């Protein structure tokens, strides 16, 4: 790897609908806008940011597997897979890449089934309830952590 940090941003199911899907919960910012802002932030930090959004669990898992050996950190909004996917958990454990779990809404203030995450206990940290800003905070936290370890 080069001297730049390589960070992978993963977004799970239905996040492609951001901006129009339940904006009272998720806001009016689109995923394209979030990613564009993060790319600009990453460029200013000399970070290589890759992004994938998928509604398919296996596509996210395959991308996590591909990250092994060439990615320093993962930022993931697993969306509904948060509450259901042991497979995503196993993939993240398998590649041993540190990650931060991101949620736009405060999952703890929502329906009880959204309170459990299969990922949070193995994550470096969890950011929830801060809307699109949560992505910016996660990127900054990842870079801070990577900088301290180098």
From Swiss-Prot:
It catalyses: 3-dehydroquinate = 3-dehydroshikimate + H2O. Pfam families: DHquinase_II. InterPro entries: DHquinase_II (IPR001874), DHquinase_II_CS (IPR018509), DHquinase_II_sf (IPR036441). The keyword Transferase does not apply. GO terms for molecular function: 3-dehydroquinate dehydratase activity. The record marks 21 as: Transition state stabilizer. Pathway: Metabolic intermediate biosynthesis; chorismate biosynthesis; chorismate from D-erythrose 4-phosphate and phosphoenolpyruvate: step 3/7. Keywords: Amino-acid biosynthesis, Aromatic amino acid biosynthesis, Lyase. SUPFAM superfamilies: Type II 3-dehydroquinate dehydratase. Its EC number is 4.2.1.10. One of its GO terms (biological process) is quinate catabolic process. The keyword Lyase applies. The active site is at 26 (proton acceptor), 103 (proton donor). Substrate binds at residues 77, 83, 90, 104-105, 114. It is an enzyme of class 4 (lyase). Belongs to the type-II 3-dehydroquinase family. NCBIfam families: aroQ, PRK05395.1-1, PRK05395.1-2, PRK05395.1-3, PRK05395.1-4. Homododecamer. Catalyzes a trans-dehydration via an enolate intermediate. PANTHER family: CATABOLIC 3-DEHYDROQUINASE. This is 3-dehydroquinate dehydratase. It comes from Yersinia enterocolitica serotype O:8 / biotype 1B (strain NCTC 13174 / 8081).
